[in-house]
UniProtKB/Swiss-Prot annotation:
It catalyses: D-glucuronate = D-fructuronate; aldehydo-D-galacturonate = keto-D-tagaturonate. Pfam families: UxaC. One of its GO terms (biological process) is D-galacturonate catabolic process. Its EC number is 5.3.1.12. Gene3D superfamilies: Metal-dependent hydrolases, uronate isomerase, domain 2, chain A. InterPro entries: Metal_Hydrolase, Uronate_isomerase. This is Uronate isomerase. Pathway: Carbohydrate metabolism; pentose and glucuronate interconversion. It is an enzyme of class 5 (isomerase). GO terms for molecular function: glucuronate isomerase activity. Keywords: Isomerase.
Amino acid sequence: MQPFIDDRFLLQNKHAEVLYHDYAKSLPIIDYHCHLSAKEIAEDRRFHDMTELWLEGDHYKWRAMRALGVEEKYITGSASPEEKFQAWAKTVPYCIGNPLYHWTHLELKRYFQVGVLLNEQTWKEVWDHCNELLQQEGYSARSFMIQSNVEWIGTTDDPLDDLMDHQKIAQDSSFSIKVVPSFRPDAVIEINRPSFLDYVSKLGEVADLSVDDYGQLLQALENRVRYFHEAGCRMADHGLESMPYAECTLDEARVIFQKRKEGFALSREEEEKYQTFTLCFLARLYYSLGWVMQLHIGSIRNTNQKMFQQLGPNTGYDSINDFFFAQPLNAFLNRLERDGQLPKTIVYTLNPAYNYIVASTIGNFPSEGVKGKVQFGAAWWFNDHQDGIIRHLNDLANVGVFSTFVGMLTDSRSFLSYVRHEYFRRIVCNLIGSWIEKGEAPQDYAFLGKIVQDICYFNAKQYFDLS
């Protein structure tokens, strides 16, 4: 049988092969949004077995296993690591058509030199081989990053985080990869969360002030933003179920915050007013510091109440939202632009039905001397498969200038997920190669190769000012 993963994987014509192998393949990786643990990088975590490395916290895999009816004990429960790996291996063949199938075999091939298909027959051979390698030098958290040619990553961090692990990494001259924090203040934006007031109290503690009113909350946020800035942070990230926008004055925001603090229920309008004012305050602060603002919009979180109570958040029970989007997004960006305080912004939509809304909106807010100031963020989460990536690139190209795109990110908690950059690069090269093949683009490898390199590396390097 011909190897499943070979040099031509996903490259369906000679033009795609030239673009990938001559222009994209060897570029370093800038992974500007991920969920890796800075502590695990600082400590250069070693993994006892493949279940620790591969299945711990990977809700993509968990969802696939549940879809096949696998008992929860083999997913997040009491089964042994070997039993959990076996359950995943039995699942893999049935993931055909899902990116998990490609990612699984790319990861085995690139990091463990495993060329066989993972399934019920091969699981023990793969388990033993990979676990043996994990005990050797060169198979730690940092080693996987180095082997992947990673240059720079952005983690996702709560405002309460002391960032000590990031500082340890920065001070370690033996490790050249830059690991920088991103400011993720969702717990402050979501004023109707049951835990909101408790979180605000903790925020005040780390910001060295008592948060008794809305003005003090804004000061606490500013204190933490500046703390993050001193630790090397240059990005913020916001996860929003929908895009809020409702005009709000400072006095109104103060009243709404006080109402929540006194235990009264807030209306949807009050919630949106608070969110709008607070997001605008933060965005202006980001602008003043030269940060990039990321908006991840459109996920419904923790939809299965029974399983949320059993397992908590980020365990595979989230999905795509639908909502009123175009007007609030444009109003929010316009408000900041009108005041001359719109930071570089990346807008991600989880719902691909809104691709054209985002792709057209970003063109409304250009800036002289800045290439692609407002970006249509990479195909995300339920869209980071071949069809989703192609749809995103085509939609961006159709109504914008896709050569300005800042490229792929892993959005992952796994140290093996850097193969997603290879996956993305192959898809980009195959897409452009198909345009050449169909006569829709010239066979100008030097020019198109430069566009490939920009999308895969250089645009991000420039956008995040990494030079």
